[in-house]
Amino acid sequence: MSNRGTQFVIAGDVANWHAQLHEALAAGTSQVEAARAAGAPVDDDVLQFVDHPEPGPGWEFVYAQPEQFAAHAVPVLSITGMYDDSSGGTIANWRRFVAHSSDDVVARSHLVVGPWDHMGTHFGEGRVGELVFGPDATVDLPALRRDWLRHVLDGAPRPDLLRDRVMLHVAGSERWIGVPSLEAASAATATRWLRGVDGPMDALHSGFVEDAPADGPDAVFTCDPHDLRTAAIELQPRPEGSGPQSPFHGQPMNNFIMTVAGNDPTNSRFVVELDGQGVVYTSAPLTDDLVVVGWPELHLHLECDQPDADLAVLLHEITPGGDSIMLSSDLLRLSCRRFDGGHEWLVPGEVTPIGFEHFKWCQRRVRAGSRLRVAIRHASSIQANAYPHGRPADAPAARVRILHDAARAPRLLLPTADLD
């Protein structure tokens, strides 16, 4: 946004970058100034996004406008991946493009959503870290772009992969499906309810994901800006070959934000090592396959003793062998839940309905025998905390209570597709 190139020398030394930010976070000093001291291009354009992160109309200037879409006649080929940390923006812009462009332009355009991470959207490798997909997931994307341009500009045959407006690779089924729109990919909704249990409700003593609502004890956890145990995990490297690989970065590090964003789909540390900063729910083994295609949602009621808190939701498949595979996630600053650019502060001690309605797009067949796992936790890390200019010494910890009576049991909505 500052019309400058990415600082790959700075961004590429991930271990050093994490250490610099962690030092400032631990001291309670400005991470913005730490970034500036490390050589990052911190200017007014960057600070605009740091100081005004509220989603809403304030971000409208970065988007192409309806009249701009309506005026152009150029088709597009948009490529992203289920584990691409930029998939949210890519898909949002595609939907905006479809809504405001002419029918003729849309008819000649395509969206491809593979199983890839961000680097995979350049080269189409059929794996993300330890997660390996079937042979059809490997696509020569440079050749696809070349052949599509020849098709659009010179009338050459359309690439075989682009047989429908939207092409989705459904992991687990390991096949491509074509649909006329993203919305058409979801045929139904599977609803699950979360039930609390007595105890810490961590990964080893979790609550339940069930087929019907039921009474259970409320779940309580803490969002403490002074608790740096999650940040300490981010100082540790991922085992060689296990995390996301990029020619622009060195040894992959544990990274909360990138894990939530999808780039490290087999990393479960930020769920397993909650340390009282969140709660976990696990289902019984599925009796039938569940093909999740679309945007999940989670609706719950909570009470907080502070006017705000930052929360993350992580949805995983746990295979019969115990492997963890990310399905989707969401991040929410509770005061920004209206997405209107403003803040609606929580009333401490008052029960508030909260909807997590901006999950990442998911496209995966969860096989019978696997389990669903949902983690709700404090969203704070080296790269995302509530005090980028320095943490006040008296910054309060928030105590969050999720209600679990049957009438207000948390409700998980899973969009499903029928591929059989």
Q: Which residues fall in each region the model found?
A:
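Short beta-strand/loop motif that positions the catalytic acidic residue
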Residues: 78-80
